[in-house]
């Protein structure tokens, strides 16, 4: 729950981190997390990213793109029946799958670049799990209320009101899950046609099965499992942790200015006593969708969504302190600031860590309560360094190579194969007949006519034994 600090008018939350070594046993039932709604720059950024990503996913299959009478008019289509992939003006054939492979490699390198610069920004902002959990939380807050109201509802005995709220929430979740699964199949067939067939019961069984599976996974992962998918099921946190270095941005509690904590920091400081900026209000814990306390340091569960930054900045504004007690920072920047604050490294269980107790508040605010101007803050140097430049160079080289290959590719493919049995036939007049299978792929969107001829063999002629035409393109 929450209470008002009498000295600072800052709301203090009774919030304990769920995902911490002290509170999590090896075999233990899930402890439900009730994240509080956050407000601030990063929350607004997440709203924008969520709206854009969901909009792209749900709207894209319905966008039309005129390719002429001999090709589908859906802008983005994976045409499994005809072995084609359409993306606006680009048409990819099976033998050109290296374009798709190249795009996947570029996506991987782009993800490496993002991780090396801004940490787990993919997890915090654009990962489908994060986006759909955010969407489900919007529904949960709209139906059941914010954090305190949801906690009270969970603790209350079952009643008509509680049942109605739970039923409404899960019903809306299921509608979202069905819509998510339904839209997915529209990427593999003409969306309006398949939608009509689906609603009238005439769609293929695989369409209904796919929607059913995706509905179940969306509902379970987004509504029920939530943070457990990130913590236990997804391998990416472990991979990303190995890709971070001392110049990668991560969400960091700057204990060099936050320690020692006091819930009456403003009053105690006015009395001439030395305390840090953290008032131990637990606002950062209350808003965290992963149920961690960022003040305990870097943790596997942290998806760097930065909602704790928004919550803490709001508290700092109320206290009249500088923002940034929790901020995006690099390890190199953090180490330099801890050293400037007078902290020393000590050995704890074999780890060389900074001693918070050694922080000297006079070093943090040496003059008139202002932060020491020597403290480092994130600059362009954390983004522009050899590692990121190499990633950018490789990414650009791949992109340019794919573009050149795309615009220089042949729009005609001819395959000639000799019949194996018999190799040849001697006719009654002594002539020799050879059989060949000729496959002509017209890779343009309009029909074309082709002429076959034989060069270098005097008196040779060609007979057409049979022909197949597929959609004017082969």
Model regions and ranges:
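Membrane-embedded alpha-helical bundles of multi-pass integral membrane proteins
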Residues: 2-261, 309-310, 322, 326-396
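Hydrophobic alpha-helical transmembrane segments in integral membrane proteins
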Residues: 400-423
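Membrane-embedded translocation segments of transport machinery
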Residues: 256-274
